[in-house]
């Protein structure tokens, strides 16, 4: 059977107290609705329809995915009305309904769920709670068959005691939806068209209503305010941390790691507290990451040590490198094996060769540095003239003395030396020495100025 996924994302989210549409608030650095789109994509649906309303243009601009169609719900008249807006875009045999503010539903749960659906079966995802307050209840008959769902505001005292609740997620045939959605009524406490009323229709028409519960209750938790958003963020991060630890990664405090992207981390990696991993991050075996580091779209080679408070953004780091503390690697930086970038060093769009050292207080931009180069403290590559960027080349074995300025474009040759305090504006040949500083003048018996 072909599958269409309908994602309801039209709500304003008044309790978020935000100009941003609710479904665009992020969990792990990604909009909630994008989490749902990505989970749905694991099912390889023929079609995904997102029902939008409040802030629709923002939502459309923020979501990525293949074969996504958009249906507008101009008036917020309930979940049944929302699904009805999607139906003109649905031609597939089966329809799965998901919610843009329920971001942690797992692909494996969805796969098990849709596997229960056929022309004669409607699947309903439920959950049993100790405290079901606020949720619609699942009403069953004496043979344990699902009869209907009753919303809390419409429930009797007996129905309020039921602990099995509706999560809102359901799947059924397109034909059933096309036949049943026009029959929904808004004659209820909310004055809305409830999607949940379809369950009674299905039961009365002889459809088998099959229920399934997720392995983890938080998979179906929704977000209505920032407190709930923060709670799901912590749940997500804890789940990611536990997966890493089971895969052989040491986390010195699992509650103080944030993953905001797609990470691949090998075994025997050690990660200290308050580390943030964003975007696409690959970390090979034996890497040690100190506290308060941020890695964004970075590849880190085996055995590398990253000291505290280091930012690595869009960089490739080789094996057995040493970084930090307080280093900043900006996009386009590539370090060969055994390179060292020390404290208060910034690099950008530069290659640093094998075994080269840039240990202290230095800016390396638009540069190509060979093997075994030593760059002294306070060195600046002057790469920008206010309009254009130029390259600095330091060839193998070059030695740059402290407090030097290298005015690009400039090349320092193989095994060449630049004396400390120099401003270099011309190329230096292989094995040469360049010293470019004013002559020292000493004044004997100098009297300092006095105040007043």
Curated annotation (Swiss-Prot):
Residue ranges of the region described as Pyrophosphorylase: 1-226
EC number annotated for this UniProt entry: 2.7.7.23, 2.3.1.157
Location in the cell: Cytoplasm
InterPro entries xrefs: Bifunctional_GlmU, GlmU-like, GlmU_C_LbH, Hexapep, Hexapep_transf_CS, MobA-like_NTP_Trfase, Nucleotide-diphossugar_trans, Trimer_LpxA-like_sf
GO annotations of cellular component type: cytoplasm; membrane
Protein name listed in UniProt: Bifunctional protein GlmU
Single GO BP term: regulation of cell shape
Subunit structure: Homotrimer.
Purpose of the protein: Catalyzes the last two sequential reactions in the de novo biosynthetic pathway for UDP-N-acetylglucosamine (UDP-GlcNAc). The C-terminal domain catalyzes the transfer of acetyl group from acetyl coenzyme A to glucosamine-1-phosphate (GlcN-1-P) to produce N-acetylglucosamine-1-phosphate (GlcNAc-1-P), which is converted into UDP-GlcNAc by the transfer of uridine 5-monophosphate (from uridine 5-triphosphate), a reaction catalyzed by the N-terminal domain.
Details of cofactor binding: Binds 1 Mg(2+) ion per subunit.
Coiled-coil stretches noted in the UniProt entry, renumbered to this chain: none
Catalysed reactions, semicolon-separated: alpha-D-glucosamine 1-phosphate + acetyl-CoA = N-acetyl-alpha-D-glucosamine 1-phosphate + CoA + H(+); N-acetyl-alpha-D-glucosamine 1-phosphate + UTP + H(+) = UDP-N-acetyl-alpha-D-glucosamine + diphosphate
Domain of life: Bacteria
Residue sites binding UDP-N-acetyl-alpha-D-glucosamine per the record: 8-11, 22, 73, 78-79, 99-101, 136, 151, 166, 224, 330, 348, 363, 374
Listed pathway(s): Nucleotide-sugar biosynthesis; UDP-N-acetyl-alpha-D-glucosamine biosynthesis; N-acetyl-alpha-D-glucosamine 1-phosphate from alpha-D-glucosamine 6-phosphate (route II): step 2/2; Nucleotide-sugar biosynthesis; UDP-N-acetyl-alpha-D-glucosamine biosynthesis; UDP-N-acetyl-alpha-D-glucosamine from N-acetyl-alpha-D-glucosamine 1-phosphate: step 1/1; Bacterial outer membrane biogenesis; LPS lipid A biosynthesis
Active site: 360 (proton acceptor)
Pfam entry (one): Hexapep_2
Positions bound to Mg(2+): 101, 224
Residues involved in acetyl-CoA binding: 377, 383-384, 402, 420, 437
